[in-house]
Amino acid sequence: MSLILDDIILSLTNANERTPPQALKTTLSLLYEKSKQYGLSSPQLQALVRLLCETSIIDTVTKVYIVENCFLPDGYLTKELLLEIINHLGTPTVFSRYRIQTPPVLQSALCKWLVHVYFLFPVHSEREHNISSSIWLHLWQFSFLQKWITPLVIWQATTPVDVKPWKLSIIKRCAMHPGYRDAPGSATLILQRFQCLVGASSQITESIITINCNRKTLKSHRNLKLDAHFLSILKRILSRAHPANFPADTVQNTIDMYLSEIHQLGADSIYPLRLQSLPEYVPSDSTVSLWDVTSLEQLAQNWPQLHIPNDVDYMMKPSLNSNVLLPRKVMSRDSLKHLYSSIILIKNSRDESSSPYEWCIWQLKRCFAHQIETPQEVIPIIISVSSMDNKLSSRIIQTFCNLKYLKLDELTLKKVCGGILPLWKPELISGTREFFVKFMASIFMWSTRDGHDNNCTFSETCFYVLQMITNWVLDDKLIALGLTLLHDMQSLLTLDKIFNNATSNRFSTMAFISSLDILTQLSKQTKSDYAIQYLIVGPDIMNKVFSSDDPLLLSAACRYLVATKNKLMQYPSTNKFVRMQNQYIMDLTNYLYRNKVLSSKSLFGVSPDFFKQILENLYIPTADFKNAKFFTITGIPALSYICIIILRRLETAENTKIKFTSGIINEETFNNFFRVHHDEIGQHGWIKGVNNIHDLRVKILMHLSNTANPYRDIAAFLFTYLKSLSKYSVQNS
């Protein structure tokens, strides 16, 4: 439909004095209809602004009607559109005396429209922001623009840096001009905004007192109202054009947030404005503004009377450089700024409708909608606030942990999950497992869709969920829920699309190791009375782990099997979980050391016939190479290279002149090495105590068992469950 509106705007642009009135009327009727139906893009609006401000074939009343009823954006607006409007505001100067003068009533209508759609414009860079805020203040000096430029000036002022002495001078001079009817009220509101940003300032206070705007006028200016009919049409167009970015409730709440910045101006003043200059005046409530507190001692002394300013947006921002207008007595308040979020939550009694809560929710929504230039500064603040209140964390999780926000911004969602989930506990057990299973399943489907098989989002989020479960299992009320959800996470982590990419995606390995470590710690507890079904992992999962080529994962599995030993001894051998665990131990000892894979009934649930057929079809360098040599710690994928490295370290430690050069350690290569170097070994020796392959494997295991070795639990497993190796256990040494 953009093409239809392009044609309509082009037709209007090409119209001139010779265009038949009926043709122009028909084109305008189409503009009225189609703009309300589909909305206008930023380039289309820019073309219309230029047309309305420069054409003479459309009367002023019609131009104003078009701005008020047809300027309905279908998405975000550009700074080019903003510059187009600015270029047509004001009156001709000595430098632009021949510029076409835009009618003042049309200029006012354009500024009014900007106020209604301000939330759709991008966040400026710091330099652009400084220039833009200066331009708006200069335009504010035109009396016919003051009413609608005042909100723009207020919204543009967001940091103490925006408060400049020259701005105060301009505002005060205009406010005192007798011909400017709206200036006193507008100027006072802007000054109150500045005061919110810089705190107590004698220069700002004196200006407000000098202007002396009466309460009734100030209240009427502060009570800004927008066109509800226009906004209802705008919300419908935005939500239909971009449902993910512009849900109707999000748009309305964003607008309300901007309006509240104006409605609440002055509400945090310590003294009524007219009595500000009277030194003998004592306020009835004896409140002390948080802005005036500069030390912990002051904070403690004034706690009952402490008043929280309404400018949450500034209070939650990272510390900024002090402004030149700040008096020395409050220059150090930034040192307390890290406490502001805590103070706000405590003073608001954790009221979910309070402004800090709403600020956190809407700032996060703006982050997901890419409306914030520096989300890396905002998100840590929100995480810090939510970490102190579980209810706020619950609201954030319920609102943002879903596929909708994942699609909007994966990185932001990962930051939110990483910061909030590990410390969060559910208030209600019912529905929590289902919520997270649905959430993680949706992330899995999204992460493994076509072309995204190596996406880390799923496994990284799993890791954060498991950190959360680690916290849950310390709570007796949540342990059953936590362990049930843990097994759900393990099932997802061992799905082929994730597990097969574990080597390139370490988050999946970290997540699964975390899940096993949780079960390991619970199994070690002497007073553990958790049902055994929560502690034993099913064969579909464990068999994949055992056959993994990841030594860290294999070591974690061995650590888990050793930890569950004492727990399982409390149950009869006929118990299905005991039999399941015994099968794990039998398979893993055969695989790692006993070398009875091909003679056993099965290995990890797979028939030995399968392995025989594979091994018989492998290319072997020597004809007498036996199939059995492919197994044990020195031959399996997870440990073969590690064993080579350990052997080289053993040779270096004993300063051997002869080096084992084969890339494979097994009985055949070892015997061949001894046969070739028999005389040299007899003369110079090799590794002390190593005379056969069994001795070498024991030496390697002893080296593995070192407490500093990340794979030490593999050795501990074999020392625990193999009688022939039990004498090498650390406990028996």
Curated annotation (Swiss-Prot):
GO terms for cellular component: kinetochore; nucleus. GO terms for biological process: attachment of spindle microtubules to kinetochore; cell division; chromosome segregation; DNA replication initiation; establishment of mitotic sister chromatid cohesion; meiotic cell cycle; mitotic spindle assembly checkpoint signaling. CDD domains: CTF3_NTD_HEAT. The modification N-acetylserine is found at residue 2. The keyword Cell cycle applies. It is found in: Nucleus; Chromosome, Centromere, Kinetochore. Keywords: Acetylation, Cell cycle, Cell division, Centromere, Chromosome, Kinetochore, Meiosis, Mitosis, Nucleus. The keyword Nucleus applies. Belongs to the CENP-I/CTF3 family. Component of the central kinetochore, which mediates the attachment of the centromere to the mitotic spindle by forming essential interactions between the microtubule-associated outer kinetochore proteins and the centromere-associated inner kinetochore proteins. Required for establishing bipolar spindle-microtubule attachments and proper chromosome segregation. Component of the kinetochore, a multiprotein complex that assembles on centromeric DNA and attaches chromosomes to spindle microtubules, mediating chromosome segregation and sister chromatid segregation during meiosis and mitosis. Component of the inner kinetochore constitutive centromere-associated network (CCAN), which serves as a structural platform for outer kinetochore assembly. Present with 319 molecules/cell in log phase SD medium. Component of the heterotrimeric kinetochore subcomplex CTF3, which consists of CTF3, MCM16 and MCM22. The CTF3 subcomplex is part of a larger constitutive centromere-associated network (CCAN) (also known as central kinetochore CTF19 complex in yeast), which is composed of at least AME1, CHL4, CNN1, CTF3, CTF19, IML3, MCM16, MCM21, MCM22, MHF1, MHF2, MIF2, NKP1, NKP2, OKP1 and WIP1. Interacts with CTF19. Interacts with CHL4. This is Inner kinetochore subunit CTF3.
